[in-house]
Amino acid sequence: FYFNIEFNPNKIYFAGAVMNEQIPAENGSIYKTDKVVMPLKSAEEIMEEGTQQHSYDIFLDMVYNLSELKYNSNATLAQPGAEQGLEVDSLFDVTFPDLVANIHNELTGNNRRFTTIYHRGVMAPTDQALNTFLSTTLPEYNSYDELSLKIKEVLVNSHMTRNPVYQSDILTGFTNGAEDSVMLDPGNIIQKAYGSNSTFIGLDKAIEPRVFNSVCRPLYVTRGRFELMRAAVEYTNLLSALKKSNANYGFYLPNDFGVGVGTGDSSLIRVDVNKELDIYYFEAFNMGSEANDRYARNDLRRKILNHIAVSPPRAFSASKEFLRTLGGNYLVVNHDNGTVSGTSTTKYGFG
């Protein structure tokens, strides 16, 4: 599939070449092949080259946005002249801690002697495909530079896999790095290559993350209105539960202007520890102590779950309807005045 040759089960292949003859040697064997085997390229190199008609620059830039550099003192000091006190370059290891595939590193396994045993999968959409995706799915953004790192992480992991993607996977479906089930349309494949660290597929249509079609959709496709709740959902690791495809949830979603600092009631306040590394926690104003309390992660998780009904309202003829939530409580839907509330008062917020 990746080498564009017809498979014959009676032959042995190596990187697209057919092995014809085995010659015994003192310390192993020598194999003759029917053609020269060129060194495999990494996923990074494949995307950097692109094709004559297509470029993967936008996707590659998003991957680079999610990289981390770690200073490698051993490699730096091993350079010629370093021991003599000469000035040498500082060398760094590049990693992608939030992605399931490392497009740069060619030693992908836990044991650094292994390479292809721990192959990953990369499915890169072309620039044109991503521009179309931006205009149709994320129209409130002018470019991918405006997306938060978390949204980029979801997008990129949706185009990666922990395991190689083979032709059988394309036919039957597979799970991507965002834990979504994916069925690729073979008609959307414009390039395929077997790389040194992953299988590579170029696409003329981007894969839409399932979260963009779930009740969490407003958190990701709108801009500047639900940033607090999106950060809270990610902070509490609730995303996988809220994007279940076989559920029928009702998400009663407060916007930033209703709960945050400023015009909001201060019932959900984000406190940034390190904006560059996206490290933060949450507080809420306590009316009793007249001070801010820091949310424990589990407490905030329960609070969010109590905004999500296990089913949408049904009895529109009734004045009030009680909906059970994922957090175990009930939401009261008042059809007379169009409001939604909990079943008890809260000490948080001043609104």
Language model: regions and residue ranges:
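Mature, structured domains of secreted/extracytosolic soluble proteins
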Residues: 1-351
